[in-house]
Regions:
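Immediate flanking context of iron-sulfur cluster ligation sites
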Residues: 61-78, 154-155
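Mobile cap/lid helix-loop segments that border enzyme active or cofactor-binding sites
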Residues: 1-62
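Preference for long, well-ordered alpha-helical segments
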Residues: 150-162
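Helix N-cap / loop-to-helix initiation motif
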Residues: 64, 98, 149-150
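Short Fe-S-cluster ligation motifs
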Residues: 107-132
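Iron-sulfur (Fe-S) cluster-binding segments and ferredoxin-like electron-carrier domains
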Residues: 44, 86-104
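Short cysteine clusters
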Residues: 81-84
Length: 162
């Protein structure tokens, strides 16, 4: 449940209506995060740009959506955000994730057969970032560099905070 009310489609704010129009056009829908942020549409606009670049593969064209979703879901789980876990689990399911796969992300993903070595490296990096332990685990970046380009590592890092 949001702490602020969601801005509705019938809002009097022309700026919020334009923001919603952009979301529908670029993302296919208006997320609850945007509905809350629409109280300040000018501040919300860059968030939409980030969401588009992070979630639409045809925009960045660099990192597979599956890897992005794994990273986003791991971060949600580590933060203990039930809403985020539910929302991002649905994203995973829409990409074909099995329930066991979703469960494995929160457990011992490193020994799971669900994930490739590259995916494990991305999930581990997200874990190190979220828990602020990346300096204690230099091997996490070394593993990433085995499988991903610098541009892909930037995307993994950015969606870890999504």
């Amino acid at each position: 449940m949001a702490l602020l009310p969601y801005v509705q489609d019938d809002t009097d704010s022309k700026a919020a209506q334009l923001l919603f129009e952009h979301c529908r056009s670029l993302l296919g829908r208006v997320s609850n995060a945007i509905r809350v942020a629409a109280h300040s549409p000018k501040v919300a606009q860059p968030l939409v740009g980030f969401m588009v670049s992070a979630l639409r593969t045809e925009v960045s064209g660099i990192l597979e959506m599956r890897v992005k979703a794994l990273v986003i879901l791991k971060t949600s789980m580590l933060n203990g955000c039930a809403y985020c876990i539910g929302h991002n689990s649905a994203l995973g399911r829409s990409l074909g994730f099995e329930e066991g796969e979703i469960d494995a992300i929160s457990q011992d993903f490193l020994s799971s057969d669900y994930f490739s070595p590259a995916e494990k490296a991305a999930i581990h990096w997200a874990e190190c970032l979220t828990e602020k332990t990346y300096r204690k685990h230099p091997e996490a970046m070394a593993q990433l560099k085995l499988y991903f380009s610098d541009a892909q590592i930037v995307e993994i890092t950015m969606v870890s905070g999504f």
